[in-house]
Amino acid sequence: MRLNSLSPAEGAKHSAKRLGRGIGSGLGKTGGRGHKGQKSRTGGGVRRGFEGGQMPLYRRLPKFGFTSLKSLHVAEIRLNDLAKVDGNEVTLEALKAANIITKNILSVKVILAGKIERALVIKGLRVTKGAKAAIEAVGGSIEE
């Protein structure tokens, strides 16, 4: 078997519709577009969300909330997420390597949620009071 001898399975690919190639093709003359109207013209068609002149849904509904720009580079992580980090030292780079946070995160805060099973050394991360107590209770430490 060679690359040049490969072909798709029988019936796996449909032949393309050849529009406007005579009435015998079944798709001649109007080419499946019907007669007249905006959608039959070249470049015709309405924009996404257009409802025929009626006030569209995206304008009938009120604006709601906003996206904080701070959330794009600040993250909160739970105590049980720390278990996914290899080794016993948790830094910003270690969290990125373990796919717990995305690469654009610049600052992380550890919050008291979930359980921590092993002693870890937290470096360069912010920690809540409750999370700090839980980390120190299992023999871990926090370094600035």
Curated annotation (Swiss-Prot):
Keyword Ribonucleoprotein among UniProt keywords: yes
PROSITE patterns: RIBOSOMAL_L15
SUPFAM superfamilies per UniProt: Ribosomal proteins L15p and L18e
Keywords: Ribonucleoprotein, Ribosomal protein, RNA-binding, rRNA-binding
Feature: compositional bias, Gly residues: 21-31
Region (Disordered): 1-52
Domain of life: Bacteria
GO-annotated cellular components: cytosolic large ribosomal subunit
Paired cysteines (S-S): none
Molecular-function GO terms, alphabetical: rRNA binding; structural constituent of ribosome
InterPro entries: Ribosomal_uL15, Ribosomal_uL15/eL18, Ribosomal_uL15/eL18_sf, Ribosomal_uL15_bac-type, Ribosomal_uL15_CS
GO biological process: translation
UniProt function note: Binds to the 23S rRNA.
Subunit structure: Part of the 50S ribosomal subunit.
HAMAP family for this protein: Ribosomal_uL15
PANTHER family on file: 50S RIBOSOMAL PROTEIN L15 (PTHR12934), LARGE RIBOSOMAL SUBUNIT PROTEIN UL15M (PTHR12934:SF11)
Family listed: Belongs to the universal ribosomal protein uL15 family.
Identification of the protein by name: Large ribosomal subunit protein uL15
Species in which this protein is naturally found: Haemophilus ducreyi (strain 35000HP / ATCC 700724)
Gene: rplO
